[in-house]
Amino acid sequence: MDNGTLPVQGSLDRMAALAQYLHDTDLAYYDKIYVSLDWHPINHCSFAEQGGPWPSHCVGYTTDALVTDSVLDELKRWMQAGKVEFIRKGEHVDFDEYSALDNEAVAAHLAYELRQADRLDVCGVVGTVCVQNTLKGLIEKAIDADKITVLTAYTAQFDADAEKEFVKWCADNVIALA
């Protein structure tokens, strides 16, 4: 988030907008909402202290690893309807999982469920890292790109250059932006 250990400019505003979207959206619109969470051990291999590329971030059980309060408040209505599933990624100390589909414990089941969907709306933080890798994972798991839409108003990037890179990647892979 903006003020986290791996700050992403504008992410709090994007998550506030996502919370409003969830508030305004009828429960019947989505069959299921999957929320992936970076959930790293304190000595994760991706951290600079361990020789990785990133500062320490999203350490499990810290506020860095959680969804924002505003999004969680709006998810509660969906959770009461049995429509939310949380997926942790990056829990293993020795390798990273940038995609929600990299978590081998849930990947096959998740891919199966997502293949059954008529449409998939995807959003999150950080677009060029976790969101883009999740999109790649969807395509690798034989999920049709034509039913995927990235909700850009709720997708935060590191900076304007990353935003351009992400938009180009989506266009190159025939993934719709809304």
List each language-model region with its residue ranges:
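Glycine-rich phosphate- or other oxyanion-binding loops that anchor nucleotides, phosphorylated ligands
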Residues: 84-115, 119
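Short, small-residue-enriched loops and turns at beta-alpha junctions
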Residues: 94-95, 155-159
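Glycine-rich anion-binding loop/nest that anchors nucleotide
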Residues: 118-133, 149-156
